[in-house]
Design a protein with these regions (language model features):
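Metabolite-binding pocket within alpha/beta catalytic cores that recognizes anionic/polar moieties
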Residues: 1-134
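Glycine-rich anion-binding loop/nest that anchors nucleotide
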Residues: 9, 81-85, 161, 187-195
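Short, flexible loop segments at the rims of nucleotide/cofactor-binding pockets, characterized by
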Residues: 59-64, 164-167, 184-185
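Conserved active-site and cofactor/substrate-binding residues in soluble primary-metabolism enzymes
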Residues: 63-70, 78, 137, 141-145, ...
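Positions that flank functional sites
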Residues: 90-91, 165, 195-196
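Active-site rim beta-loop-alpha module in soluble metabolic enzymes
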Residues: 135-181
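A C-terminal functional module that forms or caps the active site or interfaces directly
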Residues: 174-197
Length: 197
């Protein structure tokens, strides 16, 4: 079995990870430009990890302007085998209270201004049409590990959920939130898509 290296993308308020031991900062560039911030490598409980602040550590990049492709490319180039992300979300369901963890398994994309693929013929990628399957956009094995870790830590957890990702930076109107809830949305945020793709 190959060695696991975890990429961690932190969202709003998640800029420093105290659990990361022996941190080493590295600035990188990618064929898609610079990622949101420097990569910070270290170990958590003996596991190699690379942490990246999605909005940068100064919280200076709006959701629409995040270079999602550069972020993912940079983590892949650093050898990350898995990526775990944290996002600030709002609940669309009464059963999901603030502070509870929702392990996403589906998304509804309501963004309009973001590059959705690496395969658009730019940056040395193959030109032409490339249809990507996203019926199950989140890794079931990683989701199961997160569920077990949350339960072991006594963190209230919802083992599945559908996230509605909106363009931002504005929040949804009440009418939009009721619509998203009627579609089966559990939580709402501004960054899951296209990051998961």
């Amino acid at each position: 079995m190959s060695k696991v290296k975890i990429g961690i993308i932190g969202g709003s308020g998640f800029y420093k990870l105290d659990a990361l031991k022996d941190p080493v900062e590295k600035s990188v560039t990618t064929p898609f430009g610079e990622p949101s911030d420097a990569l910070v490598s270290g170990k958590i409980e003996g596991v190699d990890c690379v942490v990246l602040a999605r909005h940068n550590r100064k919280h200076g990049i709006m959701p629409t302007n995040i270079n999602y492709r550069a972020n993912i490319w940079a983590l892949k180039e650093e050898g990350c085998t898995h990526v775990i992300v944290s996002t600030a979300c709002g609940s669309l369901q009464e059963a999901i209270a603030p502070g509870e963890l929702v392990i996403l398994d589906q998304f509804i994309d309501r963004t309009t201004k973001r590059a959705q693929t690496f395969y658009d013929g730019t940056c040395g990628q193959l030109p032409g049409i490339c249809h990507l399957p996203v019926a199950e956009p989140f890794c079931s094995l990683t989701r199961d590990c997160l569920k077990k870790a949350a339960e072991a830590s006594n963190i209230p957890v919802h083992p599945s959920g559908t996230c509605v990702t909106i363009e931002g930076p504005r929040f949804s109107s009440k009418a939009e939130s009721f619509l998203f809830k009627s579609w089966g949305g559990h939580v709402i945020n501004m960054t899951t898509v296209p990051e998961v793709i």
